[in-house]
UniProtKB/Swiss-Prot annotation:
One of its GO terms (biological process) is alginic acid acetylation. GO terms for molecular function: acyltransferase activity. This is Probable alginate O-acetylase AlgJ. The gene is algJ. It comes from Pseudomonas aeruginosa (strain ATCC 15692 / DSM 22644 / CIP 104116 / JCM 14847 / LMG 12228 / 1C / PRS 101 / PAO1). Transmembrane segments: none annotated. It holds the Pfam family ALGX.
């Protein structure tokens, strides 16, 4: 956890920041004489006040610089950012969701019941489920964790959940070993971002592809895909938003990192007009792909190219139902209620589920509460039945 500093240093910190604020406030008063409004601006309806506010916001240094100064002092003295980020070593940043203790153990149980309920519903519809639990960035890079350590809850969270899923008959490949091996070839997670790198996404796609082929979970004619690697570009990680240091103190920020964009496309057609590696009817009687993907921004954001890497690893086209900013549960429940999914379900569904969401609460208020409760109840019922059989 974060170490405390001595009381004299705390007083010095407060005094220094207070002095800076007073100095900037005095400086800002120089901008008042420069204010002018249109001659016909009414005084009593608030327009003059709004005009002055806009002028002051533009000229007031505290408005523009105070956030930078506070963030710089927090970062340099306390090695902290805004709530949401944990500062690691060597310029690494982590989401605090991988460090927080769970509010209660019940949330993990509720989420597990939903996962089981989803599995039961997919089985009823004839859809095979592959649960891809993505190991936490902090689990893969403990060497870059700083003073703050993950709560004890996270110690065995990944392996315990994986064992639980497998015991329930859910296909859940172990992705941790593959990602650890891939670290020798480059970063599998981005230093300043919550997300994986294209290499990490490709590694997981290849591991899932091997598992699915070995277990014969997908039975479709092969379709070849090719991946093209683009130029490297500077990537600003999403965790940097919790360190509002630029433009004044951008030199304090972790060094910029490069992201090499990858794009995957179907292989070009052969001279006879047939796609390389494809059969006469790519998807049997239907043109709808028999493979689907659902999950979070790990799957939805094209920067990581997980969708493309999975297509190439499985030699099969897919429909991507993943969404950004909603976690793994909400897109899955939306999918279960999707009319097209109901009428023409895929043969196989890959559910990408980052480890950090396992004990987290999700906003499921858009769904009918009774329906969600029924899903949980069906999952819990299967769990109790399995436990009674083992007794």
């Amino acid at each position: 956890m974060t170490q405390s500093i001595s009381r004299p240093l705390q007083y010095a910190y407060i005094a220094a920041f207070g002095g800076l604020l007073l100095g900037l406030a005095g400086w800002s008063l120089k901008s008042v004489p420069g204010f002018s409004a249109a001659a016909d601006t009414p005084l009593l309806n608030g327009k003059l006040a709004h005009a002055f506010e806009a002028h002051y916001d533009k000229e007031f240094p505290i408005k523009r610089l105070g956030t930078n100064l506070w963030a710089a002092l927090d970062y340099t003295l306390f090695h902290e950012g805004r709530p949401g980020v944990v500062i690691g070593k060597d310029g690494w940043l982590f989401t605090d969701e991988e460090f927080k203790p769970a509010p209660s153990g019940q949330q993990l149980e509720d989420n597990w019941a939903l996962v089981r309920g989803v599995q039961r519903e997919l089985n009823r519809r004839g859809v095979k489920l592959v649960l891809a639990v993505i190991p936490a960035k902090a689990r893969l890079y403990p060497e870059h964790i700083g003073r703050e350590q993950p709560a004890a809850l996270h110690d065995s969270l990944y392996q315990d959940f994986l064992a639980r899923a497998r015991a329930a008959g859910i296909d859940s490949p172990d992705l941790l070993g593959s990602l650890r091996q891939a670290k020798d070839n480059g970063a599998v997670f981005l230093r300043t971002d919550t997300h994986w790198s294209p290499l990490g996404a490709e590694t997981v796609a290849q591991r899932l592809g091997a598992e699915i082929r070995e277990t014969h979970l997908l039975d479709v004619p092969a379709q070849n895909f090719v991946t093209r690697v683009g130029e490297e570009r500077t990537h600003k990680g999403d965790l940097l938003s919790f360190l509002p240091l630029d433009p004044l103190f951008d030199e304090l920020l972790p060094r910029p990192e490069q992201l090499q964009q990858r794009t995957t496309e179907a292989a070009p057609a052969l001279p006879g007009g047939q796609q390389s590696g494809a059969g006469d009817d790519l998807f049997g009687d239907s043109q709808q792909p028999r493979l689907a993907l659902v999950g979070t921004s790990y799957s939805a954001n094209p920067r990581w190219n997980f969708e493309g890497a999975l297509k190439q690893a499985l030699s099969a086209d897919l429909i991507n139902y993943a969404k950004e900013g909603k976690g793994p549960l909400e897109p899955m429940l939306e999918l279960l209620q999707d009319e097209g999914f109901r009428k023409d379900p895929p043969q196989l569904l890959v559910w990408e589920f980052p480890e950090r969401y396992l004990p987290m609460a999700s906003d499921l208020s858009q769904f009918d509460a009774d329906w969600v409760a029924q899903l949980k109840a069906s999952g819990g019922r299967d769990e109790r039945l399995a436990a009674s059989r083992n007794d």
